[in-house]
Amino acid sequence: MKWTRRDVVLGLPTLMAFNLIGCTAKTNAATNDETATTTETDKKASGATQITAAEILDGYAFTSTAADENAILVNTADEVTISNSTVDKTGDSDGGDDSNFYGKNAAVLVEGGSTTTLTNLTVTSDAKGANGIFSYGGNGGHNGGEGDGTKVIIKDSIITTTGDGSGGTMTTGGGITNASNLTVTTNGQSSAAIRTDRGGGTVYVDGGTYTSNGLGSPAIYSTAEIHVANAALVSNLSEGVCIEGLNSIELTDCDLTANNTKCNGNATFMDTIMIYQSMSGDAASGNSTFAMTGGSLTSKNGHMFHVTNTNADIELNGVKLTNEDTANVLISVCDDGWNGGNNKATFNAKAQDLAGAVLVGNNSTLALNLTEGSTLEGYVDGNIVNAANQTVSTEVGTVTITLDTNSTWTLTADSHVTEFTGTAANVIANGHTLYVNGTALTGTN
């Protein structure tokens, strides 16, 4: 028995009394031509405690010490409620796709179309490939595919993970996660506090603190649609957030702080908001979207925004920006360690103060639009070196700048753009020159 009721004599409750199956793995063998569907995933997953029907459980201690086993596996289309309980997971996974895409070895795995509500849980994972709470929507890892309705609602809970490949909350395969007032801390590599992977899904977060401490472990990693409000997001080694491919992150009244001091994998830049496409198949190609309204964004090291190998839409509205890096780069759009896509970004600033260098590589494109009284204090250039001090570009690419009548740009160095739309008087030269297609703009202040 791998679970106990904490307020009764050990051994009195029985597994079958709660429609639970203890430590029983599925025995059906998958045929060779099966693709990764919910059925196939069921055959891969096993749980120390398996819940296969509607349940309401309160005040239990769930544990798993075995490799490749969930402490709790919910596999039902029914509603399940677990509250005031602890979940402890040890036992390393062999890793790979089963852990990252389908929830093998997670502390809690929910699949099969269930709506599972988790309240006041303490979840501790100390193993490799052991995500904290995993919502798998059953679409077999098909990016853009609909899920089966699996939804995890988790609130007022603590999640701590230690091993590599162990996110706090994990959503894949079209799953849905609704989280509120969580305290999530991850310590391993590739262990985002709010994590998603192949097949995507939808994530809503309201309130709480989400901290990542490992390499390649941003506070949020998006291969999904993610909305976060009223939360504190902290990354102490990696990017603050990463968006891969045709996916999105929306932050509302959040405080995001990142101190990216080490490159991971193919990356050759350090940054706080990284938007890219790896071409690994984990995310469909298309426009990546990052939107932030209110709150604060603090970049302690590297570029504040970095776009590479994808098309990105960035929107800021009334965000307090703090760039503590001495180079003071607001955004770089350029080549990095991936190829096969474009380096192209549209940056919309609304009622927003911006500061820093705008770096656009020779084969890259940026449209920067300032509206509703936004300000930019900075310059545009194409001379770019990466974190290894290697030259990436020596000439500026295609840059268009648009200022509405209430927005201004104060130059901090000579700047070169392809196109300028707005009133020249809204450009404060500050002793410098703005060149538009090689011609100095006249009429600046």
Residue ranges and their predicted role:
Residues 395-401, 411-421, 435-436, 441:
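Surface-exposed loop/turn positions within long extracellular repeat scaffolds
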Residues 1-15, 24:
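N-terminal secretory signal peptides and thylakoid transit peptides that target proteins
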Residues 31-43:
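Post-signal peptide N-terminal segment of mature Sec-exported envelope proteins
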Residues 64-71:
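Beta-strand-rich domains and repeat architectures in extracellular enzymes and scaffolds
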Residues 23-32:
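Bacterial lipoprotein signal-peptidase II cleavage site
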Residues 96-99:
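Feature marking well-ordered beta-strand scaffolds used for ligand recognition
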Residues 43-59, 74-92, 104-125, 134-162, ...:
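Surface-exposed loop/turn motifs in large extracellular/passenger domains
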